[in-house]
Every structure is written in C-alpha cells, then in structure tokens.
Amino acid sequence: MKQWVLVKTFESLFAELTERAATRPEGSGTVAALDAGVHSQGKKILEEAGEVWIAAEHESDEALAEEISQLLYWTQVLMVGKGLKLEDVYRHL
C-alpha cells in the first residue's frame, strides 16, 4: 500500500507564514523571526545561502534539499516582514 506524504509548496509555506504573522501564536519561531527584523533575517539568509553552497559541494542531495528548504523559509520570512506578496517576486521571474 502506497503511503502519501504531505508536501508543502512554496505557496502553502507563504500562506502559513502570512497566517502566523497575522495571528502571532505564542511561542512561534516564525513570530520571533519576524520580530527580530530585517537585519537579523538578512543575516540568516546569508548563513543559509552559505550552507546551501557547502552542502552542494560536500554533502548528500538530501542535506542539500534540507538547506535549500531553510533558505526558502528565511527568504519568505523576510518577504512577509517587508510586506511583499508572492506576485511581487513572480513579476521578476
């Protein structure tokens, strides 16, 4: 029997982060990341980008995928914090 795994998409992650920003659940790491501000978020993006590069050079594809997911998360946190929408970015793709 085939087991289905729930997959989060770029759009569903953005919706989840936007919801957390609006509802501000207590103890949320996303809320803390948003409250830390752009400087802190930018530093995390740089850190994660470096980890993506290192994983691509020296680690497994699974480790690389995990690092990319973290980079996407922090990029979206910054987007939400700055009030950007997905369409604002898609317009430039």
From Swiss-Prot:
Hydrolase found in the keyword field: yes
Single GO biological process annotation from the record: L-histidine biosynthetic process
* Cited CDD domains: NTP-PPase_HisE (cd11547)
Record carries keyword Glycoprotein:
no
Single GO MF annotation: ATP binding
Keywords in UniProt for this one?
Answer: Amino-acid biosynthesis, ATP-binding, Cytoplasm, Histidine biosynthesis, Hydrolase, Nucleotide-binding
* Top-level EC class as recorded in UniProt: hydrolase
Pathway annotation: Amino-acid biosynthesis; L-histidine biosynthesis; L-histidine from 5-phospho-alpha-D-ribose 1-diphosphate: step 2/9
Cell location: Cytoplasm
Name the major location: cytoplasm
Report the GO terms under cellular component: cytoplasm
What reaction(s) does this enzyme catalyze? 1-(5-phospho-beta-D-ribosyl)-ATP + H2O = 1-(5-phospho-beta-D-ribosyl)-5'-AMP + diphosphate + H(+)
User: EC number(s)?
Assistant: 3.6.1.31
Xref: HAMAP family? HisE
The text of the family note is: Belongs to the PRA-PH family.
Q: What is this protein called?
A: Phosphoribosyl-ATP pyrophosphatase
Organism, scientific name: Rhodococcus jostii (strain RHA1)
Q: What is the lineage of its organism?
A: Bacteria, Bacillati, Actinomycetota, Actinomycetes, Mycobacteriales
